[in-house]
Amino acid sequence: MGQKIHPTGFRLAVSRNWASRWYANNNNFAAMLQEDIGVREYLKKKLKNASVGRVVIERPAKNARITIFSSRPGVVIGKKGEDIELLKSELQKRMGVPVHVNIEEIRKPETDAQLIADSITQQLERRIMFRRAMKRAMQNAMRLGAQGIKIMSAGRLNGIEIARTEWYREGRVPLHTLRADIDYATSEAKTTYGIIGVKVWVYKGDTLGRNDAPVVEEVAEEKRPRRNARPGGDRRPRRDGEGGGPAGARRGAPRRAGGAGGDGKTGE
């Protein structure tokens, strides 16, 4: 009870795309997947100060193409491209195939879920109050165009002995609307009291397709007529004897007990 489905996995092939895009047979699939996980962990440690949001790995025809989304591309590239060349050579050793590295800039890091989660965990490790860090991140995201944001922190918050979970939400975050563009990410803060987990949901509006098609406004449904409404607007005239009473009798008027004599007997 109370558990939420992973927003990215729920929307795969509907409004989200995979982070690893390649095909493999049954023999190579596990090894290639493990290789992707190792590459992402290596890049996360290597580019810890570069504010990396996500890494997309593609494998076209015995090559590898890695796209790094970062809010600080200058840190990744380095002076005269030295750092990125070293990074490319290290990745080629790990993957065993020619590697092409592309850098994409994140224009609004305040609305990127992974960067928000990493920022909060870094503040928690510096002993900043978790409520202050969460609310500041929510205010920045809403100010820069997010339609809704929800942040959850779990663990020994403020060093208390009993772990608990606290979450805050601003705006709307429709988790079960498939066309809703929900950016979801997690991060962990390693504090002296233990690990504090942070989850972030950011609602950026509705999309059609895989984050590239615009939203088409829904056409308002025509008002359906009532079942007893007639084209002319007037009700059908009532026929004599309809409704169970004598002709011309008003609804609710008392019925006479007998026939014409009114004594309850007939034919006498």
Swiss-Prot record:
GO terms for cellular component: cytosolic small ribosomal subunit. Keywords: Ribonucleoprotein, Ribosomal protein, RNA-binding, rRNA-binding. Residues 248-257 have a biased composition (Low complexity). Transmembrane segments: none annotated. InterPro entries: KH_dom, KH_dom-like_a/b, KH_dom_type_2, KH_sf_prok-type, Ribosomal_S3_C_sf, Ribosomal_uS3_bac-typ, Ribosomal_uS3_C, Ribosomal_uS3_CS. Residues 216-268 are annotated as: Disordered. The keyword Nucleotide-binding does not apply. Residues 258-268 have a biased composition (Gly residues). One of its GO terms (molecular function) is mRNA binding. One of its GO terms (biological process) is translation. The keyword Nuclease does not apply. It holds the Pfam family KH_2. Residues 39-107 form the KH type-2 domain. Residues 232-242 have a biased composition (Basic and acidic residues). PROSITE patterns: KH_TYPE_2, RIBOSOMAL_S3. Part of the 30S ribosomal subunit. Forms a tight complex with proteins S10 and S14. PANTHER family: 30S/40S RIBOSOMAL PROTEIN S3 (PTHR11760), SMALL RIBOSOMAL SUBUNIT PROTEIN US3C (PTHR11760:SF19). Binds the lower part of the 30S subunit head. Binds mRNA in the 70S ribosome, positioning it for translation. Belongs to the universal ribosomal protein uS3 family. This is Small ribosomal subunit protein uS3.
